[in-house]
């Protein structure tokens, strides 16, 4: 997997299959990028975590399951037909054709599920399901153990790949593919079952947490961003 070193919303994230594709990505990139192992676990969650600088233990404030964009075959239609049937997948047609150009005219067998975009980003067609109620003490302890080892990390979302939800809840058999900092969102709010009012409430709650962390860091001697630095960070 190739991705921008500093990215947003899954933009620029591509699965590379050979050296030619990597060279093409390099030639068309005007930014620093990372080459990352492709994790073959089937599932992904986003785990939102925070810890106040003067406290030893942090907290998980939300967990979201990411359902990758996919289609199911009926034994009659081509992959392209199936993609175009669903507005969510049709919106991603250009990206799908780039990655699966040799498969678009294949008839997909009945009930076979094809993952179109193997990235858990809302802007890449993934559906977000709030599973915050699945957070266990064992999982919270393991995430806390990991995050406290990252110097200066007090707030953000960990994107995690896993195979089995029960093992994940036990704090086992998962891999972290990204750690997102203060620009990250509590993406469990994007579950279609939640209202806009729930989303506003979650955003407000997390901004208050981030502001409190900022004040505590300032008290410890870390300077606030000036106006120029603040606007630059927003770009």
Please report, for each region that a protein language model flagged, where it lies by residue:
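Active-site nucleotide/adenylate-binding loops and adjacent lid/helix of ATP-dependent enzymes
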Residues: 1-98, 136-140
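A generic structural signal for short coil/turn motifs at secondary-structure boundaries
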Residues: 10-12, 129-130, 188
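Generic detector of well-ordered alpha-helical segments enriched in charged/polar residues
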Residues: 23, 27, 80, 140, ...
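Coil-to-beta-strand transition motifs
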Residues: 42-44, 52-59, 152-155, 169-174, ...
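Conserved active-site beta-strand-loop modules that form the wall/rim of enzyme catalytic pockets
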Residues: 46, 56-59, 103-107, 112-115, ...
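Hydrophobic side chains in beta-strands
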Residues: 49, 65, 160-162, 179-181
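A long amphipathic alpha-helix within ATP-dependent nucleotide-binding catalytic cores
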Residues: 81-170, 216-234
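C-terminal active-site "lid" helix and adjoining low-complexity regulatory extension at the edge
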Residues: 163-235
């Amino acid at each position: 997997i190739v991705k921008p070193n500093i990215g947003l919303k899954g933009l620029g994230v591509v699965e590379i299959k050979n050296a030619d594709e990597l060279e093409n990505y390099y030639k068309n990139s005007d930014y620093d990028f990372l080459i990352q192992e492709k994790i073959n676990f089937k599932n992904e969650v986003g785990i939102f975590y925070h810890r106040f600088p003067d406290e030893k233990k942090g907290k998980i404030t939300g967990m979201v399951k990411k359902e990758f964009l996919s289609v199911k075959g009926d034994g009659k239609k081509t992959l392209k037909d199936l993609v175009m049937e669903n507005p969510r997948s049709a919106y991603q047609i250009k990206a799908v054709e780039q990655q699966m150009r040799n498969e678009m005219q294949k008839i997909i067998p009945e009930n076979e599920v094809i993952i179109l975009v193997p990235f858990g980003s809302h802007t890449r067609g993934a559906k977000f399901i709030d599973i915050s109620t699945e957070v266990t003490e064992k999982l919270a302890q393991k995430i806390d153990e990991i995050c406290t080892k990252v110097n200066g990390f007090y707030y953000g979302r960990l994107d995690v790949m896993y195979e089995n939800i029960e093992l994940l809840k036990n704090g086992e058999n998962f891999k972290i593919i990204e750690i997102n900092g203060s620009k990250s969102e509590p993406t469990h709010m994007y579950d279609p079952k939640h209202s806009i009012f729930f989303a506003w409430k979650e955003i407000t709650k997390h901004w208050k947490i981030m502001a409190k962390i900022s004040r505590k860091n300032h008290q410890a001697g870390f300077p606030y961003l000036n106006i120029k630095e603040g606007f630059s960070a927003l770009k």
